[in-house]
């Protein structure tokens, strides 16, 4: 896997958006912010993408809705190239899917793995969020 080094957040980084978590929603939000021309990073406490599908690794873990409905629909090429092996995919397959999406869209370069949010404070004077993490501070317009 092609992951960012743990805690790779410069001390006074400023971006348009900070997203907490690299699960389904966090990966989509990073993709969406980039497509709008925004600079963004994702802060993820784990050492890889996946969110729930990274953390919940127990026998029999699987999706409880049809997997095709669980897939991203914003990339027709991705929809065409990824074939689910089961109607209700298992945790390992869903995690592989999210890893594939992160790699295909080069999302990992803007994800800070093994990084926890310690606080987020709105600064009235600058109209920005001041986010303190386990690896440093970040200033952003949007905290998601």
Segment roles from a protein language model:
Residues 1-17, 35-36, 64, 96, ...:
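Extreme N-terminal leader/targeting segments of oxidoreductases
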Residues 39, 54-97:
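Glycine-rich active-site loop/strand segments that organize a redox cofactor
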Residues 50:
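Short alpha-helix immediately C-terminal to the canonical SAM-binding loop
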Residues 13-42:
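N-terminal Rossmann-like FAD-binding beta1-loop-alpha1 element of flavoenzymes
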Residues 84-143:
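Feature captures the FAD/FMN-dependent oxidoreductase FAD-binding
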Residues 34, 54, 103:
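Short polybasic/polar patches that bind polyanions
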